[in-house]
Amino acid sequence: MSSEMLPAFSETCNVERQKNLSEDGEQNQKPGSSERFQPISKRQMKKLMKQKQWEEQRELRKQKRKEKRKRKQLERQCQPESNSDGSDRKRIRRDVVHSPLRLIIDCSFDSLMVLKDIKKLHKQIQRCYAENRRALHPVQFYLTSHGGQLKKNMDENDKGWVNWKDIHIKPEHYSEFIQKEDLIYLTSDSPNILKELDESKAYVIGGLVDHNHHKGLTYKQASDHGIDHAQLPLGNFVKMNSRKVLAVNHVFEIILEYLETRDWQEAFFTILPQRKGAVPTDQACESCSHDKKFARVEGGLNSDSSEEENRHELDSTHEEEKQDKENSTESTVNSVPH
């Protein structure tokens, strides 16, 4: 290759190299190329794993639903012919005794909650509705001040709520259609302890999921409006590791359970979730007294052993002093000339 051709050849190589570099740069800048190599966080990985597991178990869930339908069909076919007219169902329904007690979920705190908490409240209300429908002593269920974010969320995610039965859903505040002297607001901040339920009264549960951001709000509202207030006798029967504030559905279900059993302790321990770490107060007191007694006995043993050691040390010291005295006397006697 002649010296005249070298500059042209090197220039051509440089042009091709720049072209390749620009193509690589464009490829790297394509949308999605950087996302492909982004690391996945642990939370995203868990979501992906759950989604994958959900998809893998789709057929299994379908099969279980199918088996459940077949099982129910067989149960219906095995029923005696005398019950073919539905008399058995009527007998079961006759066992249900509706309570005149009015139980109200006050939804007037809509503006104090973010959407995530609104959705939680919606689920708790769904649970209350379902439990009341299957209860042996269902209450007169009221949902008041219904509107705002809650109604919007129910319209979007639970359109069937408009067909709910045995429930009074009202946009008005409960004070507009229930007399003040009939109302009792249930709040954990109240100094009044509820001993038993008066089924002629209307009990109000604050529909608020606030994670303790608005502590004492329901108590203040009841006091400002001159409404009687009380708290469930939780502290009389239950010792818990966590705070005494319960979810809306837990309060609702405890009242349903009490109406059936007339036993507060049984109602609490039937409904309270295990994560609350609830134990009966008498067991908690026995445990505390046992721990104190054990500590006292253990401390007594330690002090006794210390006294014994001290006495032993004193006796040893006296013995050494006596021995030294005898030795000194003996040496003195031996040193005297005979």
Curated annotation (Swiss-Prot):
The modification Phosphoserine is found at residues 22, 335. One of its GO terms (biological process) is tRNA N1-guanine methylation. Residues 1-91, 296-338 are annotated as: Disordered. Residues 308-328 have a biased composition (Basic and acidic residues). The keyword Thylakoid does not apply. It holds the Pfam family tRNA_m1G_MT. InterPro entries: MT_TRM10-typ, MT_TRM10-typ_sf, TRM10/TRM10A, tRNA_m1G_MeTrfase_euk, tRNA_MeTrfase_TRMD/TRM10. It catalyses: guanosine(9) in tRNA + S-adenosyl-L-methionine = N(1)-methylguanosine(9) in tRNA + S-adenosyl-L-homocysteine + H(+). Keywords: Coiled coil, Methyltransferase, Nucleus, Phosphoprotein, S-adenosyl-L-methionine, Transferase. It is found in: Nucleus; Nucleus, Nucleolus. GO terms for molecular function: tRNA (guanosine(9)-N1)-methyltransferase activity; tRNA binding. PROSITE patterns: SAM_MT_TRM10 (PS51675). Residues 329-338 have a biased composition (Polar residues). Residues 61-73 have a biased composition (Basic residues). GO terms for cellular component: cytosol; nucleolus; nucleoplasm; nucleus. Residues 52-80 form a coiled coil. It comes from the Eukaryota. Its EC number is 2.1.1.221. Residues 88-279 form the SAM-dependent MTase TRM10-type domain. S-adenosyl-L-methionine-dependent guanine N(1)-methyltransferase that catalyzes the formation of N(1)-methylguanine at position 9 (m1G9) in tRNAs. Probably not able to catalyze formation of N(1)-methyladenine at position 9 (m1A9) in tRNAs. PANTHER family: TRNA (GUANINE-9-) METHYLTRANSFERASE, TRNA METHYLTRANSFERASE 10 HOMOLOG A. Belongs to the class IV-like SAM-binding methyltransferase superfamily. TRM10 family. This is tRNA methyltransferase 10 homolog A. It comes from Bos taurus.
